[in-house]
């Protein structure tokens, strides 16, 4: 899997091929791995544990245990963890505390917030999407969380060619605009 903080997307990759894209939400506090920060960590990780087999997609979890309460998407009120939990383990020095920080890929009832940073460090997904992803992957699945666009990766470009050519064109236009800005304003830092 490749997660883009810029795009607020998760791209599922199976056998080296991009399969499906999901809209997600990363942390509203930013990116990083500092303990107690509520940041979304960057880098290489893997799914250490999967929790939620067989429960309804809106099942509320507290401390990774089902409460018996089931919420519909966009239910008013609080924002608990729902549906499924994929607990992440960092594989690099800078994100080695990811498991201890309890950073998950999980469902949210606040689906209207997907596509914008809204979490407290986890990677949030829609209720149906998190069940779909959960069913497609196993423990040990690789996850790469990156700051940049999915289109900066081979997998993202391949997915866009097949499913969203306009996405490729928009990305190319942004790259051209950035280059033009740098040429016309050489003292301005790179965007």
Write out the residue ranges for each language-model feature:
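A structural motif detector for short, solvent-exposed N-terminal "entry" segments of globular domains
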Residues: 1-30
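Pocket-edge structural micro-motifs
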Residues: 5, 14, 26, 48-49, ...
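Exported/periplasmic cell-wall-interacting domains
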Residues: 34-37, 55-191
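Electropositive
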Residues: 23-55
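An N-terminal domain-start capping segment
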Residues: 1, 6, 52-58
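Well-ordered beta-strand positions in beta-sheet-rich domains
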Residues: 21-23, 44, 102, 142
């Amino acid at each position: 899997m490749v997660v883009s903080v810029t795009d607020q997307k998760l791209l599922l990759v199976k056998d080296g091929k991009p399969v499906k894209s999901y809209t997600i939400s990363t942390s509203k506090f930013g990116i990083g791995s500092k303990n107690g920060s509520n940041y979304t960590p960057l880098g290489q990780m893997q799914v250490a544990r999967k929790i939620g087999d067989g429960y309804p997609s809106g099942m509320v979890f507290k401390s990774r245990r089902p409460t018996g309460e089931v919420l519909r998407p966009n239910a008013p009120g609080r924002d608990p963890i729902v549906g499924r939990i994929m607990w992440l383990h960092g594989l690099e020095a800078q994100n080695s505390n990811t498991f201890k920080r309890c950073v998950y890929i999980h469902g949210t009832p606040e689906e209207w917030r997907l596509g914008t940073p809204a979490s407290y460090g986890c990677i949030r997904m829609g209720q149906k999407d998190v069940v779909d992803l959960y069913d497609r992957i196993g423990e040990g699945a690789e996850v790469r969380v990156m700051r940049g666009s999915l289109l900066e990766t081979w997998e993202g470009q391949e997915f866009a060619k097949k499913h969203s050519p306009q996405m490729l064109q928009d990305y190319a236009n942004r790259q051209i605009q950035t280059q033009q800005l740098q040429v016309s304003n050489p003292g301005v830092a790179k965007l």
